[in-house]
Amino acid sequence: MRLARTTACVLGLLGASSLSIVVFAGPAIGKASHAGWPSINGHLKMHKTDRSGTIRGSSRSDELLGGHGNDVILGGTASDVIWGDYKPCCQPTHQHDVLLGGNGRDFIYASHGYNHIEAGAGNDVVHGHFGHGKIDCGSGHDVVDVSHRSRHRYKIRHCERIR
């Protein structure tokens, strides 16, 4: 994947002890690494701290990555890849994430905590192997991948296929 530029952006300073940083990298050109994912031709946006915050997608296909805090991640109008928590270790179960796919064929991955997921329009794929909460697939022909262990922890609506 080739990145044109990388910029660190301070989203908010709410007093001396609260700072949220999101890294914007892009526009990216290329194919993301997982089979079936859209070509990421928008931005890579991620929470680099464990603070709570909001990430908004663009009109292009973006990869939007939340951290260990309480994240609100809003997909844009194209096909996006959304992660409730991208960090591979120390997965907290106390976080509360809101993951909204928007239009397009979105790929959404739940965090280990509480997840409120609305996939939106498009033929979306939602992965709820971890955590608990609500998954509403919205319109389109959607697929939810959820482990047998986690299935009873989610209230699942409007999903054409659960596997």
What would you call each of these model-derived segments?
Residues H129-R163:
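Leucine-rich solenoid repeat scaffolds
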Residues R2-P27:
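Secretory targeting and sorting signals
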Residues G26-I82:
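N-terminal segments that cap or nucleate solenoid repeat domains
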Residues V10, C90-Q91, G138, E160:
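Secreted/luminal cysteine- and crosslink-motif detector
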Residues D50-S52, L99, I117, I135, ...:
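All-beta strand scaffolds that present successive hydrophobic residues in beta-strands
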Residues T7, K87-P88, I135, R157:
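Secreted/extracellular small peptides and ectodomain modules produced from precursors
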Residues G42, K48, G57, G66, ...:
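Glycine-centered beta-turn/loop sites at beta-strand termini
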